[in-house]
Swiss-Prot record:
SUPFAM superfamilies: Recombination protein RecR (SSF111304). The keyword Zinc-finger applies. PANTHER family: RECOMBINATION PROTEIN RECR (PTHR30446:SF0). It comes from Hydrogenovibrio crunogenus (strain DSM 25203 / XCL-2). Belongs to the RecR family. May play a role in DNA repair. It seems to be involved in an RecBC-independent recombinational process of DNA repair. It may act with RecF and RecO. This is Recombination protein RecR. GO terms for biological process: DNA recombination; DNA repair.
């Protein structure tokens, strides 16, 4: 019979995405067997992050301050606003080094079935920001899913009210991809979005 405390630790690990029962059990026993100091460090880091990290009041990205570094930066373009679903989308875009504007993080996408509407995505905050008149281009970088497309359409309609240019990230064949391995939906998007050369 397994200890209730160990079971509680395993159940806690199962709360994490992509961690199933076996992985959770391996993680729990890994920490308890020979890595208790690492376990304390992990627990401390989690507790510290949960206490100190909140949301930027302007863009809703994760931040330790009321206004995050992206919004506070004087070197970023303030007339471009990239709309993303999650903070990890911001990380991915920043790693590309291509974009130097500001962000707005939805923390999800429209999903009426799950009770996620415009208010849950912070769209009233976005509307207020668009109404200020500084944003000239809104870049929609939501995921190419049904929900992501619906969310992008909703935001596009909002931007039209303020006469703001709206662009959408291109979709299609990845660089280095081979046609025979591309799914038909992606290939269809690539054909629909083709450009003159």
């Amino acid at each position: 019979m397994q200890s209730p405390v160990i079971n509680e630790l395993i159940d806690a690990f199962k709360l994490l995405p992509t961690i199933g029962p076996k992985s959770a059990q391996r993680l729990a026993y890994f920490l308890l067997q020979n890595h208790q100091q690492d376990g304390h460090r992990l627990a401390s880091a989690i507790e510290s992050a949960l206490e100190k990290v909140g949301y930027c009041q302007q863009c809703r990205n994760l931040s330790e301050t009321e206004i995050c570094g992206f919004c506070a930066s004087k070197s970023r373009q303030t007339d471009q606003l990239c709309i993303v679903e999650t903070p990890t989308d911001v990380v991915a875009i920043e790693q590309s080094g291509i974009y130097k504007g500001q962000y707005f993080v939805l923390m999800g996408h429209l999903s009426p079935i799950d009770g996620i509407g415009p208010d849950e995505l912070g769209l009233p905050i976005l509307r207020d920001r668009l109404a200020q008149g500084e944003i000239q281009e809104l870049i929609l970088a939501t995921n190419p899913t049904v929900e992501g497309e619906a969310t992008a359409h909703y935001i596009q309609q909002m931007a039209i009210e303020f006469n703001i240019s709206v662009t959408r990230l291109a979709q299609g064949i990845p660089l280095g991809g081979e046609l025979e391995y591309i799914d038909s939906g992606t290939l269809g998007q690539a054909f629909a979005g083709r450009k003159a050369v």
